[in-house]
Amino acid sequence: MNIKIGTINFMGIRNVAFAVTLILTVIALGSWFTKGINFGLDFTGGTLIELTYEQPADLGKVRGQLVGAGYEDAVVQSFGDARDVLVRMPSEDPELGKKVATALQQADAGNPANLKRVEYVGPQVGEELRDQGGLGMLLALGGILLYVGFRFQWKFALGAILSLVHDAIIVMGVLSFFQVTFDLTVLAAVLAVVGYSLNDTIVIFDRVRENFRVLRKADLVENLNISTSQTLLRTIATSVSTLLAIAALLFFGGDNLFGFSIALFVGVMAGTYSSIYIANVVLIWLNLTSEDLIPPQAKDTVDDRP
């Protein structure tokens, strides 16, 4: 194999990358099965309390007041305008809304909280959301498998799916290890990671397919190195700009966007890695050749009639 000038030998360390991938995947799965996922109220059920303040509310201050009143599990979010606050708590107490409003009124008499509504989300609804979220993920992966298989070839499809599964496992493993609350926003982030990673993978796959036509004497490993190097600047620019935007959400978005930002941040890094060292390596394992990309020709029928 001849490495051209300007081409990085990405596949030269594929065995080391595979070992790293295996270790990280085992750690992620181990955390997943031992610590479990810290599901939020969207999936476990609980009480939703909407409060209205006379003046704009400081969410950090409200959260501190609730902790001081003994409600450590309360999740505080802005809702509507700056005076509306939504409090989520894992409790079935029908009097909880009044108790929370009273505690906040006593903590800050200058800007009292008025109870607007109280709703209880049962665990059955949460389980239904959880099942639908898992089903949505499976349907997304199935659709991707069909699309890539139709658009490219089944070997590409398998490489793409394995890389996406890896990304989802790594993200869920990190969320499990640090016990980040998994709610609907985090689920949306995981699905967004799947789409982002697939986009990276498709860009490289498209260049690999094109280079099979252009670089007829190059073997598969050389083709993968050249194709990845040719798309490297695009990959770096996209990943860095995306990570900078996510970092802004992570540091300035507050607690409400923390899980969402963490899932996206980890997912983008994992997706960039997997598009090179999982999706491409699968093509090597499956021994992709240029003949795999040539559509079968219809056999010519021979007229035996005299």
Swiss-Prot record:
Keyword flag Ligase: no
GO biological process: intracellular protein transmembrane transport; protein targeting; protein transport; protein transport by the Sec complex
Membrane-topology annotation of the record: Multi-pass membrane protein
GO MF annotation terms: protein-transporting ATPase activity
Keyword Protein transport: yes
Keywords tagged on the record: Cell inner membrane, Cell membrane, Membrane, Protein transport, Translocation, Transmembrane, Transmembrane helix, Transport
InterPro entries, per database record: SecD/SecF_arch_bac (IPR022813), SecD/SecF_bac (IPR022645), SecD/SecF_CS (IPR022646), SecD_SecF_C (IPR048634), SecD_SecF_C_bact (IPR055344), SecF_bac (IPR005665)
Any one cellular-component term (Gene Ontology): plasma membrane
One of the Pfam families matching this protein, by short name: Sec_GG
Compartment list: Cell inner membrane
Ranges that cross the membrane: 17-37, 134-154, 158-178, 185-205, 232-254, 268-288
Entry similarity comment: Belongs to the SecD/SecF family. SecF subfamily.
Subunit structure: Forms a complex with SecD. Part of the essential Sec protein translocation apparatus which comprises SecA, SecYEG and auxiliary proteins SecDF-YajC and YidC.
Function of the molecule: Part of the Sec protein translocase complex. Interacts with the SecYEG preprotein conducting channel. SecDF uses the proton motive force (PMF) to complete protein translocation after the ATP-dependent function of SecA.
Protein name per its UniProtKB record: Protein translocase subunit SecF
Organism: Pseudomonas aeruginosa (strain ATCC 15692 / DSM 22644 / CIP 104116 / JCM 14847 / LMG 12228 / 1C / PRS 101 / PAO1)
